[in-house]
Amino acid sequence: MQQLVADFFHTQAGKALLNSQKQIKIEAPETNVVGEQRLFIHSAEKAIVNSQGMIELRGEQGTSEFNQAFSYQKTVEEKAKRCVVYFKRSENYNGEYGFDWFHLGKQEDMSKGDYKFVDTIGHHYETDNDGKKVTCTDGNAAYKYPFEVLSTQIDKKRNSFEYFNIGFKLAKARIGVTPLEDFTYYIPRMTMMPDTEINLVAEIELDREENKPKEIKLQFDKADNLKLSHTTLPVRAGKVTLTISCTGELTEKRTLTAVTDDGDTVGTLFILPNSKEHQRDIKVVFVKVKTKLDGQKEKTGIVIPESITLFLNVLHQALVNVDEGVKEVEINCTEKEFAENFRYLKGIEYGIDESKAQLLQEYVMKKMVATFNTTYKCYYTVFFFGDKCFTDEGRLNGYAYQNSTYGVFFDGYNSATVPHEMLHAMGLPHSFDYQGVPFAYKYHTTDNIMDYSHHLPNPIERMSLFYWQWGILNNKIV
């Protein structure tokens, strides 16, 4: 809509709201914004005051600067007045598609790796000489330090989602029946590779029996290359398994909505574009290394099939495609020179000496060139040893260098070790490391592949990535 006023425009109301999901522009040779009692300017990300001339700041009673932001709750559209449909990962989810949502920590899902963002987003901190809390700078050891929730980061996380208010829950929240945090519907976002089929769960919650709708329909805003197993949902509380098939490339974001018979939107899911323009292609080779550290018994590294599956699944969450799949080759390091340079005797057992890590990388990379020439020059090269890796304090199952194309794994690694370490190589820090990233999370609370949740007495299976991590791995993600 375009409206032109030639002379004077005046609008007046007891309360007024200008709201846009995209952009609002106010332009004039002179603009005055007045808050007679209070003027508040807020940004969840970055606020810029820009002048090509001069900036003046005036305060009759002084000016102050603080490094702590106020919280701000923006005005949100109200929908879902009679029921709500939440889209969730399937019960047997194994990381095969990306799914990012605002965690509210439903109690029945806690043991499966769910949790509350309001208890989990913040930083592990040290105390400086002045007694102030400062974020840990050692990303590998941060988990050993105390954790503190950061409310500004939680607000930032909320604002990273599109959301609306759940009408019937908001009404109950206003009279204290429903917790305040439960009436906001944060729209989840997901990724899936072309020519794949995935399972989701639609969880239906109803208001009073007399207020329930007659019908709940499921529909895409644009159905090209997408198929859905259900076009309607039962009008009863409970869970329904849905199957979404992606039969080709998606060149733009798609929206799945649940709509009642009166046109009320009661659930929404965003599916991000997955066309070649939005994918990142890499090449990967897994190298099994044959050794003879004691001079007698040969050992060859083993590639656990589940490690390949999980590695590919996690990459696919970020729309990272391994061109032609993971290659597997073998190199021979049974020569005496290798054993003498890299073995470490612990008790009666020989293993690889971790302190020789840099020399080990140089040695095996030269061996790759000697064996295969330059065939694997532009590959992520991942080595597997049949030997343990010993340190003075204990042992390592594997490691990779940040922002590199190299990783190495030893006897004792598990299926999650490979994607965890190789995503370090691709630029991801630990999930509890709050340095140079938008968010950090309390140690061992998530099923994120970059967490240390396997340290728990009852380990949480690590298999997922957050939306912001997708963007680090693949800058073509939208």
Predicted segment positions?
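Extended charged low-complexity segments that act as oligomerization/scaffolding linkers
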Residues: 289-297, 326-343, 388-394, 433-449, ...
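Beta-strand-enriched, solvent-exposed domains that form extended recognition/catalytic surfaces
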Residues: 81-279
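Right-handed beta-helix
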Residues: 1-79
